[in-house]
Amino acid sequence: MVDQDWIKALVNIPISHAVGVVAASTVIYFLSSCFYNLYLHPLRKIPGPKLAAIGPYLEFYHEVIRDGQYLWEIAKMHDKYGPIVRVNDKEVHIRDPSYYSTIYTAGARKTNKDPATVGAFDVPTATAATVDHDHHRARRGYLNPYFSKRSITNLEPFIHERVTKLLSRFQEHLDNDQVLSLDGAFCALTADVITSRFYGKHYNYLDLPDFHFVVRDGFLGLTKVYHLARFIPVLVTVLKRLPYSCLRLIAPSVSDLLQMRNEIHERGGDEFLSSKTSEAKSSILFGALADTHIPPVERTVERMLDEGTVILFAGTETTSRTLAITFFYLLTHPECLRKLREELNSLPKVEGDRFPLATLENLPYLNGVVHEGFRLAFGPISRSGRVATQENLKYKEHVIPAGTPVSQSTYFMHTDPKIFPEPEKFKPERWIEAAEKKIPLKKYITNFSQGSRQCIGYTMAFAEMYLAMSRIARAYDVELYDTTKADIDMTHARIVAYPKAIPGKTEHVGEIRVKVLKAL
């Protein structure tokens, strides 16, 4: 009877009173959480603006409403408060190249990934999205053999074959006087390489007339909702469960990507394991599904599709954008291009200009071009915090409690004038000078991160850069077409760097396009 009386009382509460109670409770909760974060939180003594310390609200405004511009606010915080700042209620950001290896450590210290950075794409079983240190170490161990130096050396002939195909597309655009998108062409190249490595076959993306394909469109589509999905992780989960007819209306590029993923899932592992080709049997997917030493829960088709989604994204757009930006700088610095060609032309002739990777890696100027390209392309630009789980960290006089996400930003590392004088300039010579003076400049290139969670595909990315750059640079003369510095200047940080809108330009914003002038 008492229970029924309570129910009747609740039902009879006026709507206005109920709304008032909810509103008052919300205000009390908000004010109490602000008070706690400002005056009682373990990070209360870390410098920074109070508006950032009270919660994620300032970050939400600059990342979601202003579209990936919190990086610039963090820069202002450092300018005002110093090298260590509190960028939200939970996270500390440090701008100090000498401290990078302490955060992104390769030692025995257990370091988890910041959970706030892994939920946006809803691939919870992928290695890159694995929060726990030990679990990540085990999952990475399954993949390491496929990305070892030896494994990439064995992949060289295939990369060369794909570069040869790409050169034929350069010739096709020359013959037909067509504009060539370097972003699209290089993305097709890297996608062919990574799909072959993961699935055991490539999809001939380099054959597509305009290099327009699902993987790239899907990635670019997801970057547009990345920051919103970080704050509302269920967003992508909901999108994945919508009927394709609905999803196509909301996000057509994402719907195509998810449809491809689901088709692979429906075919299942048995069909894949029945493949007899040597390419399939050497792939990551085949190896993982067939290896009985791996626990069954770690080699399900669903988990491998999560793994494949991340590897495809990480192995296509980031490397291809770096290639395109590097060529942009070479084309706007003809003296650098001349020096590169002279160095390449000094090599003994080999069939098809298919120089071994080991030879190319030892060319000083090419090495400088590649590293300067990685430096100015930045790669993944969003913060990716690490969490020391077992001990406090100390930065100068500040103690950072265990369990606190701590991050540094690649952009600040790559543009630090103390490390890279005149950081805005493309200067391959800086790497030659550093090598001569035995300055370890390479340790400040962090687009692949560092430590135990360094990008597993960095050896493949370097191989693609060296092999593609060496052959294309000496094969064709090209010139930029409707492309300026504004197309590569970073304004928005959405996983990778994006430029701002360019007045008067409505198409191909941020795309590096060229006309092929002649074969060399």
From Swiss-Prot:
InterPro entries on file: Cyt_P450 (IPR001128), Cyt_P450_CS (IPR017972), Cyt_P450_E_grp-I (IPR002401), Cyt_P450_sf (IPR036396), Cytochrome_P450_monoxygenase (IPR050121)
A Pfam family hit: p450
Membrane topology: Single-pass membrane protein
Positions bearing carbohydrate: 447
SUPFAM superfamilies cross-referenced by the UniProt entry: Cytochrome P450 (SSF48264)
Documented EC number(s): 1.-.-.-
Localization in the cell: Membrane
Transmembrane stretches, start-end: 10-30
Binding residue positions for heme: 455
Pathway connected to this protein: Sesquiterpene biosynthesis; trichothecene biosynthesis
Any one GO cellular component localisation term in the record: membrane
Consequences of knocking out this gene: Results in the loss of production of both trichothecenes and apotrichodiol and the accumulation of the unoxygenated pathway intermediate trichodiene.
Induction: Expression is positively regulated by the trichothecene cluster-specific transcription activator TRI10.
Cofactor(s) this protein requires: heme
Enzyme class label: oxidoreductase
Keyword Transmembrane part of the UniProt annotation: yes
Superkingdom: Eukaryota
A single GO molecular function term of this UniProt record: heme binding
Keywords, ordered alphabetically: Glycoprotein, Heme, Iron, Membrane, Metal-binding, Monooxygenase, Oxidoreductase, Transmembrane, Transmembrane helix
Role according to the record: Cytochrome P450 monooxygenase; part of the core gene cluster that mediates the biosynthesis of trichothecenes, a very large family of chemically related bicyclic sesquiterpene compounds acting as mycotoxins, including T2-toxin. The biosynthesis of trichothecenes begins with the cyclization of farnesyl diphosphate to trichodiene and is catalyzed by the trichodiene synthase TRI5. Trichodiene undergoes a series of oxygenations catalyzed by the cytochrome P450 monooxygenase TRI4.
Protein family (similarity comment): Belongs to the cytochrome P450 family.
Miscellaneous section: Trichothecenes are sesquiterpenoid toxins that act by inhibiting protein biosynthesis.
Protein name: Cytochrome P450 monooxygenase TRI4
